Amino acid sequence: MRFRFPISRLLSVACLLILADRSVEGQTNDKAAAIPIEASALLDAPRPVPQHLVKLFDRMEAANRRSQDVFRKLSAPQMSFKPSNGTHTPRWNAEHMAGRQLMFFSQIYHALDPKIPIVNLNPRQMPKDYRPRHPDWDGKQEARFMQRVDDFCRRYAYLLEDIQLEDKPPATRWPSLKALLLQMERHYDEHTANVEKKFALPDWPQE
């Protein structure tokens, strides 16, 4: 029996891969858009996450969803709020968390299957250098992109079947796959907590 993947989720994965609004590492936008995507691969349900990775994948995704729950409530002005204490905007935190996860996993997946591009959407690190990818997006839209990153990671997780938790994954500096998955969980929780602290600042926009 063939299982069908929801159309909205198909579009999420496809849009993430062709990256019409940003270039992938080492490729122009035109080349990224030309990456072949087989319709049958998208229409079929994704292969399950390898059993030995399920627990830590679930933990990473749960942390992402907790973060989405916080961002989803924010308006576009709140997402772009620049704290007087010089810390990052909530939008930077959303882009940074999703960007790091996407880059690390796409590096690994590309090493295992070169048809999958390396995707680097990481924002500049320093607040003064930061330029948002979508300055008009509200928190719901940023949360949807964060979910698409999780969808991408889960869809191609079958490539990790022969990599054990204590093994060093290819093409990254991470000492083990376990270390990467646990750090992604911590990363979401830490940055989300930093965003929540901004709500108590006197200049936080009330909307």
Label each PLM-derived region with a short phrase.
Residues 9-20:
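Bacterial N-terminal signal peptides
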Residues 41-51, 135:
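Acidic/histidine-rich, surface-exposed loop or edge segments in extracytoplasmic proteins
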